[in-house]
């Protein structure tokens, strides 16, 4: 038995001429091949799944590696029209008897980003992730603190606005402030987060309606936050999504949610 997470990159892709023969659709065969090659190069994916044989420090033994997953599907929209598209998505199945405080979001996002950058110029605008929070156990504080220290090494004058949304069930109704406070605590003094007072700039998210977990038009049960982070990058978006997921857990959320982080206009 497995539980599943999913990550999707949103943005604009300008294909290189020499990669024009590659295609990608809902089944995503080309993207899957690119992503799997990259994952294998990093040592992050194995057809053997979540465990691998460790040879060091004495006799060989089977150990768990939270950077691996058991199986995956992938696809994307490479339409060449200059519009924001869901460029790449990948699902990852994880055995139910293996639970960690974090999901392999950074691993999956990195290989997706590398894959699409291999075939063209990419303007990355947003990220969404399906987070099965009910499956996570343990404390991610140390990891999130280390990520915060990494992003602290940036020019504070170049901070950027980011829109964050959470699609959750009735249990999170009215908990905007509690979640906001938990997000701010985890971001520290290098980033900002506030409950959105009005309409949120979601121009960095593709116009999809439920595909791969995200529905841009969904209104009911959506928490909205206006954030500022030290930089805009794939890694920074993953950090925001992970921080938000951990804040939701702290606020009592124990269900599957969809979290987005997307670049907002400076004037919004």
Regions found by a protein language model. Name each.
Residues 1-42, 135-176, 264-267:
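Short, extreme N-terminal segment that most often corresponds to the first beta-strand
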Residues 59-60, 67-79, 141-153, 197-216, ...:
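Short amphipathic beta-strand and strand-loop transition segments with alternating hydrophobic
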Residues 110-150, 224-226, 232-268:
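Acidic, proline/glycine-rich low-complexity IDRs
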Residues 45-57, 117-133, 192-220, 250-268:
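Short glycine-rich, low-complexity/disordered patches
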Residues 170-246:
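Intrinsically disordered, low-complexity segments enriched in Gly and acidic/Ser/Thr residues
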Residues 1-111:
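N-terminal leader/presequence regions that precede the main folded/catalytic core
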Residues 82-94, 157-171, 213-231:
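Short glycine-rich, basic-tinged beta-strand/loop micro-motifs
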Residues 104-202:
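Surface-exposed beta-loop interaction hotspot
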């Amino acid at each position: 038995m497995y539980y599943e997470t999913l990550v999707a990159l949103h943005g604009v892709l300008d294909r290189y001429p020499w990669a024009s023969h590659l295609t990608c659709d809902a089944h995503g065969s080309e993207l899957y091949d690119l992503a799997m090659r990259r994952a294998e190069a990093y040592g992050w994916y194995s057809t053997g799944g979540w465990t691998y044989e460790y040879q060091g420090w004495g006799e060989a033994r089977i150990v768990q590696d939270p950077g691996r997953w058991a199986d995956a599907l992938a696809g994307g929209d490479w339409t060449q029209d200059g519009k924001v598209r869901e460029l790449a998505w990948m699902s990852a199945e994880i055995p139910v008897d293996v639970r960690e405080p974090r999901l392999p979001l950074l691993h999956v996002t990195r290989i997706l980003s590398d894959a699409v950058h291999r075939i063209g110029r990419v303007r990355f605008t947003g990220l969404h992730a399906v987070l099965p929070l009910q499956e996570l156990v343990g404390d991610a504080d140390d990891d999130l603190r280390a990520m915060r220290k990494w992003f602290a090494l940036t020019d504070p004058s170049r901070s950027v606005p980011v829109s964050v949304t959470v699609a959750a069930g009735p249990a999170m109704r009215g908990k905007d402030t509690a979640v906001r406070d938990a997000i701010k605590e985890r971001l520290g003094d290098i980033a900002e987060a506030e409950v959105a007072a009005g309409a949120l700039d979601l121009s960095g998210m593709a116009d999809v309606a439920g595909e791969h977990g995200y529905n841009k038009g969904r209104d009911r049960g959506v928490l909205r936050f206006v954030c500022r982070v030290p930089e805009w990058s794939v890694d920074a978006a993953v950090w925001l999504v992970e921080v938000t997921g951990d804040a939701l857990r702290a606020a009592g959320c124990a269900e599957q949610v969809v979290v987005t982080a997307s670049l907002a206009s400076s004037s919004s």
